[in-house]
């Protein structure tokens, strides 16, 4: 399991550099990324779609897979707890007992805190910048490598 997570995130980072530089520049320039932007990167990283996939199509695909609720919209800003949930769910994160049972953004955030990826004092509803999003992906990859 740990090897598959490591492999997944190795592929994620490889794909990050292979992606359209315009998309990467676009996300890094944002102070607050949208759910559609996060969905796009999760889909491309996990080979759920091609680089030419639109943010809306990526969001709709992940919504069908229960990553998002039916009431959520792709242009809404994404919260820190939802980013943790997207990353964890896309990597099939095992997590602690509560995350294993409930598989919710709340417990995904708590898992990221317990793994040391995030400090204990972060707020679940705070918005995430593009650079923070990439740092969370990178932080999760480092933890996955250590656990191998």
Feature names for model-found ranges:
Residues 11-13, 65, 137:
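Prokaryotic Sec-type signal peptides and long signal-anchor helices
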Residues 55-67, 76-80:
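Acidic helix-start/capping segments at beta-turn-to-alpha-helix junctions
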Residues 18-37, 42-52, 71-148:
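Terminal recognition/anchoring or ligand-binding modules at protein termini
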Residues 4-14:
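Sec-dependent N-terminal signal peptides
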């Amino acid at each position: 399991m740990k090897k598959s997570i490591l492999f997944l995130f190795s592929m994620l980072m490889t794909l990050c550099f292979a992606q359209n530089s315009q998309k990467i520049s676009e996300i890094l320039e944002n102070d607050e990324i949208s759910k559609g932007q996060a969905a796009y990167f999760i889909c491309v990283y996990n080979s759920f779609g091609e680089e030419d996939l639109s943010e809306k199509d990526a969001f709709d695909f992940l919504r069908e897979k229960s990553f998002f609720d039916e009431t959520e919209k792709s242009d809404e800003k994404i919260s820190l707890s939802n980013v943790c949930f997207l990353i964890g769910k896309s990597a099939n994160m095992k997590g602690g007992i509560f995350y294993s049972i409930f598989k919710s953004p709340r417990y995904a955030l708590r898992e990221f805190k317990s793994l040391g990826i995030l400090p204990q004092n972060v707020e679940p509803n705070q918005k995430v910048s593009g650079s923070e999003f990439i740092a969370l992906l990178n932080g999760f990859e480092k933890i996955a490598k250590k656990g191998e």
